[in-house]
């Protein structure tokens, strides 16, 4: 699997560098580095590449290769000289035997001018498209021929990477062999909340880090997480609320036996609540919830509570800025049902309703 370099994360509110960091967290070899340190290492690597830090090392390697290639043609040239001397002796013996003068002159011209000379009789016989045999040692001479160019080094224009890689720095090769873990605490406790110090927006993904409370089958757990209908409770007025659907992009198990779920924002809904006993309390803005079907209809349950029942404990809810706030979820209390919901706005595309 290739890193998410050519994917347009910017349209979803995520930079390519941030997507690469997420990829390393999920698929890397137990990398324990926060995004701030990951970005600092990337910028340092970019600085070294721009300053030509590895140019001297690369030039030394190229010089060694050139020396090897220069030695090989000289060996073949020495062998060819001995072959030419033998051929001259054979030509002298044929001349004494009384060969034709035209053939003798063509052979002398061939040997005098070199392998790149084509006799006139051969070119006339074979035509413009004929293949003319040349000595075997000439294939080594081709490597030593330098082809001039009309462009000067300062006139060279870098190739355009296209719209898929608008951030040109993402195409630079990583020269860092090892990313050492930073001193910031990742596990435990998970502290990714210092990455972004703003509240979630309609175009910003949410990353959940989950821990298993008991052993779970990997394929079953992954399928169950991908099938959940996550929503963000934006606000509530009386018995009406605004919900932001959060589509599950992927759910993977990390190298440290944790689960990561990336939620991508989708449509905004206007939902009408149904009161069961009395008005539910504790509905806070930006509360992550899950819609699940029940005997009484579609029920809105807190994500932390419902995930805990299925064996998952929420370790982090990115992007909060300090720690998991008390208002990010609420206790079940009274059951909260939704009678109907309609789409009021969308950022990317229209999707079909949660309800049949």
From Swiss-Prot:
One Gene Ontology biological process: spermatogenesis
Protein's UniProt name: Testis-expressed protein 19.1
UniProt keyword terms in alphabetical order: Cytoplasm, Differentiation, Meiosis, Spermatogenesis
Quaternary structure (record): Interacts with UBR2; does not lead to Tex19.1 degradation and stabilizes it. Interacts with piRNA-associated proteins DDX4, EDC4, MAEL, PIWIL1, PIWIL2, RANBP9 and TDRD6. Interacts with L1RE1.
Cytoplasm found in the keyword field: yes
Gene Ontology CC annotation, any one: cytoplasm
InterPro entries assigned to the protein according to its UniProt record, in alphabetical order: TEX19 (IPR029093)
GO molecular function, a single term: piRNA binding
Originating organism: Rattus norvegicus
PANTHER family cross-referenced by the UniProt entry: TESTIS-EXPRESSED PROTEIN 19
Annotated function: Required during spermatogenesis and placenta development, participating in the repression of retrotransposable elements and prevent their mobilization. Collaborates with the Piwi-interacting RNA (piRNA) pathway, which mediates the repression of transposable elements during meiosis by forming complexes composed of piRNAs and Piwi proteins. Interacts with Piwi proteins and directly binds piRNAs, a class of 24 to 30 nucleotide RNAs that are generated by a Dicer-independent mechanism and are primarily derived from transposons and other repeated sequence elements.
Domain of life: Eukaryota
């Amino acid at each position: 699997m290739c890193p998410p370099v050519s994917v347009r994360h910017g349209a979803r509110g995520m930079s390519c560098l941030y997507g690469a960091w997420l990829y390393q967290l999920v698929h890397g070899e137990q990398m324990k580095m926060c995004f701030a340190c990951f970005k600092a290492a990337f910028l340092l690597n970019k600085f070294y590449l721009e300053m030509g830090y590895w140019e001297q090392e690369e030039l030394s390697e190229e010089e060694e290769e050139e020396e090897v290639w220069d030695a090989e043609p000289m060996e073949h040239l020495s062998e060819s000289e001995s072959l030419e001397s033998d051929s001259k002796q054979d030509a002298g013996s044929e001349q004494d035997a009384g060969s034709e003068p035209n053939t003798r002159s063509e052979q002398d011209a061939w040997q005098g001018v070199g392998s790149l000379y084509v006799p006139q009789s051969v070119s006339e016989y074979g035509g413009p498209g004929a293949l003319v045999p040349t000595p075997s040692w000439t294939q080594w001479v081709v490597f030593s021929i330098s082809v001039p160019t009309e462009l000067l080094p300062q006139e060279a224009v870098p190739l355009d990477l296209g719209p898929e890689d608008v951030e040109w720095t993402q195409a630079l090769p990583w020269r860092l062999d090892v990313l050492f873990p930073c001193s910031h605490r990742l596990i435990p406790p998970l502290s990714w909340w210092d990455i972004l110090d703003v509240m979630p927006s309609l175009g910003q993904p949410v990353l959940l880090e989950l821990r298993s409370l008991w052993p779970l089958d990997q394929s079953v757990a992954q399928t169950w997480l991908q099938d959940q209908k996550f929503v963000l409770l934006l606000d509530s007025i009386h018995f009406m609320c605004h919900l932001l659907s959060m589509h599950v992009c992927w759910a993977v198990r990390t190298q440290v036996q944790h689960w990561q779920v990336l939620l991508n924002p989708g449509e905004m809904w206007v939902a009408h609540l149904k009161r069961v006993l009395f008005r539910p309390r504790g509905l806070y803005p930006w509360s992550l919830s899950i819609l699940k079907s029940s005997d009484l209809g579609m029920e809105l349950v807190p994500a932390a509570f419902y995930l805990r029942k299925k064996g998952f404990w929420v370790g982090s809810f990115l992007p909060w800025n300090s720690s998991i706030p008390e208002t990010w979820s609420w206790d079940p209390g009274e059951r909260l049902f939704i009678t109907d919901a309609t789409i009021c706005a969308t950022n990317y595309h229209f999707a079909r309703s949660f309800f049949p």
